Design a protein with these regions (language model features):
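Catalytic metal-binding/acid-base residues of hydrolase active sites
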Residues: 8, 51, 113
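Histidine-centered catalytic micro-motifs
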Residues: 43-55
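Active-site metal-binding motif and surrounding structural segment of the metallo-beta-lactamase
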Residues: 31-42
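Residue-level structural signal for beta-strand termini and adjacent loop
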Residues: 32-33, 46, 58
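Conserved, mostly hydrophobic/aromatic
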Residues: 38, 49, 104
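N-terminal metal-binding scaffold of metallo-dependent hydrolase/deaminase domains
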Residues: 1-33
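Active-site loop-helix segments enriched in His/Asp/Glu that coordinate
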Residues: 83-117
Length: 117
């Protein structure tokens, strides 16, 4: 696969016109050249601090204070987590992972307040 456009590369995301060569999902080359595309090519994102175990409460709490939303034991998040069964929790986590993948996040680091169960 060839990806052409402006490539943002290196730690400083230096813009370089050219193409990226990908074979079998592996980056093979970054080539500087005149690109026939206005696309922007950049490295995938890494979310270094997630709580996908709380995904069931992701859209909840508009208009609440932080304390009303997350304070244990009766903040809205904690109530929603207690009320949800395992299947609902897993489905919500799967949706969060799918969203991250679809929006360019290649990996994430998960923090679990309640353990891994």
């Amino acid at each position: 696969m060839l990806l052409e456009g402006t490539i943002l590369q290196g730690r400083s995301f230096e813009p370089v016109e050219g193409r990226v060569v990908v074979e079998n999902g592996e980056l093979m080359a970054v080539e500087e050249d005149v690109a026939r595309s206005d696309d922007i090519i950049l490295p995938a994102f890494v979310n270094a601090h997630t709580h996908i175990g709380d995904s069931i409460a992701k859209e909840a709490g508009e208009g609440l204070t932080l304390e009303e939303l997350v304070a244990p034991p009766d903040g809205l998040k904690h109530r929603l987590l207690r009320q949800a069964d395992r299947g609902e929790l897993v489905a919500a986590m799967e949706r969060s992972i799918e969203y991250m993948e679809a929006s360019g996040t290649a990996s994430f680091i998960e923090f679990r307040e309640g353990g891994v169960d």
